[in-house]
Swiss-Prot record:
It holds the Pfam family PDZ. It comes from Caenorhabditis elegans. This is Mitochondrial scaffolding protein 1. The chain crosses the membrane at residues 240-262. SMART domains: PDZ.
């Protein structure tokens, strides 16, 4: 499975460098990863690969977070906020799971809308592999949670899909040994370091600047009202027409003032 770096324009573009190396069956893995100082970080046992299927009702769980809408202060990750008990994801995905990658797409540096689009782009019936950190939520207990808007990974309900479907053959979580053969050593280290906050300074500079809840969701896809254009007389309008208009008004006022002064002086003689 490929774990690609974050993309800005498209979530499926993996052409830019660098890309992490391809996992092979003969790769060996350590039980723990190390940070830049050589100290042990999170063990691989904290990571879990699960398989989830998209049905006509979606994946059956909601997500929160993102670079523009962090769920925790200083944490830009994507989290599972709730799971539908009648969905196939129930028992496989849990509330509080942190999504690290989805079908090889790095989810650790996505905006909220980019993460939603990744899930929406999957076709019905597709079984996706999702790498999650199930123990990371315990590290956030002392952090202050900020208000966020939960987005449902479920399409809009129509009269044809209102009937309750019986879910069978629920996908099971993959074992730790099985997940090791599908994940890259370098890819996991990069994802974990990003999760733990050991990111580069340039990524910190691009970190979130607003903790406002996202107003965009799958089931509430209402476009925002466009901003009213500024008039030519509005001082906030920086167009050359506005500047020319104000210069003309100023020159006209000076001309009229000069003419009136001339008539006044001439009349007194």
């Amino acid at each position: 499975m490929m774990v690609s770096p974050p993309q800005e324009d498209t979530v499926f573009n993996t052409d830019s460098d660098p890309v992490y190396e391809q996992a092979t069956d003969d790769m060996t893995f350590n039980d723990t990863t190390t940070d830049g100082n050589g100290q042990e970080s999170v063990p691989l046992e904290a990571l879990t690969v699960v398989e989830i299927e998209k049905t006509s009702k979606g994946f059956g769980f909601n997500i929160v977070g993102g670079t523009d809408n962090p769920h925790f202060v200083g944490d830009i990750g994507i989290y599972v906020s709730s799971v539908n008990s009648e969905s196939k994801s129930y028992g496989v995905v849990r509330t509080g799971d942190k999504i690290l990658s989805f079908d090889g797409i790095d989810m650790t540096y996505k905006t909220h809308d980019e993460a939603v689009e990744v899930f929406r782009s999957v076709k019905i019936g597709h079984v996706a592999k999702m790498l999650i950190d199930r123990e990371y939520l315990h590290l956030q207990e002392d952090r202050t949670q900020t208000p966020t808007a939960s987005v449902s990974i479920t399409p809009q309900v129509t009269p044809q899909t209102r009937s309750t479907q019986n879910n069978t053959d629920t996908p099971k979580s993959m074992s730790h040994s099985e997940s090791k053969s599908r994940l890259t050593s370098h890819g996991l280290s990069a994802v974990i370091e990003r999760i733990r906050g050991k990111v580069y300074e340039e990524e910190d500079a691009q970190s979130v600047t607003s903790y406002a809840p996202s107003t965009h969701s799958i089931i509430d896809d209402v476009p925002r009202t466009p901003r009213k254009p500024l008039s030519l007389l509005d001082p906030r309008n920086n167009s050359w027409l506005t500047e020319a208009l104000y210069v003309s008004i100023g020159l006209g006022a000076l001309t009229i003032s000069g003419y009136l002064a001339y008539r006044f002086i001439r009349g007194r003689r």
